[in-house]
Swiss-Prot record:
Name of this protein: Pyridoxine/pyridoxamine 5'-phosphate oxidase
Catalysed reaction, written as an equation: pyridoxamine 5'-phosphate + O2 + H2O = pyridoxal 5'-phosphate + H2O2 + NH4(+); pyridoxine 5'-phosphate + O2 = pyridoxal 5'-phosphate + H2O2
Cofactors: FMN
Organism phylogeny: Bacteria, Bacillati, Cyanobacteriota, Cyanophyceae, Oscillatoriophycideae
Enzyme Commission code: 1.4.3.5
Stored SUPFAM superfamilies: FMN-binding split barrel
Organism: Crocosphaera subtropica (strain ATCC 51142 / BH68) (Cyanothece sp. (strain ATCC 51142))
Cofactor note: Binds 1 FMN per subunit.
Amino acid sequence: MDLTALREEYTRHGLTRDDLEDNPFKQFEKWFQQATEAELSEPNAMSLATASAKGEPSIRTVLLKYFDEKGFVFFTNYESRKAQQIEENPHVALLFLWLPLERQVKIQGTATKVSTAESLNYFTSRPRGSQLGAWCSAQSSVISSRKLLEMKFEELKYKFQHGEIPLPSFWGGYRVKPTRFEFWQGRPNRLHDRFSYTLTETDDTTWGIHRLAP
């Protein structure tokens, strides 16, 4: 299939150094709020790239649940492929793509597990069906049929029919602590605006900002 004719011209916005916050977390928050105000579908959806100890890459979409200057937090099964790769190699990358705004944000950093208390706090806020789903799915493992998955869901639904559903020991959150951000704004003629934020060598709170060639 030839896709060479598929082409979009980006004309919505420009991005200059004067537009940027000195703090990349504040810049991300500003863009995220604009994506939310534009009513984009799931603006918190992000691609998460991981790699094994051998350097074998894997990527998938997960949902950002909250962020602050300590990092970006998502939740998953601790026995999943992504969790196994993070255990072997904590260096990860995140990508937010907001096509209607002709923007994307890349974040590189290291992932570490959040505390059990933090995982529990989020788990108890989830809909009951999602809580059961966390118990039900041995994520990334081979299963023989969907029917068995649905049967297990019903069994767990009956088992936990009275009272609160406990936090599974194999489920919880990760916090990605950034070491680099890149903000990309589409521009005409593929002369896009790109700016990177990288931590300086002197401390872990000062960010150097640089324009990058598209």
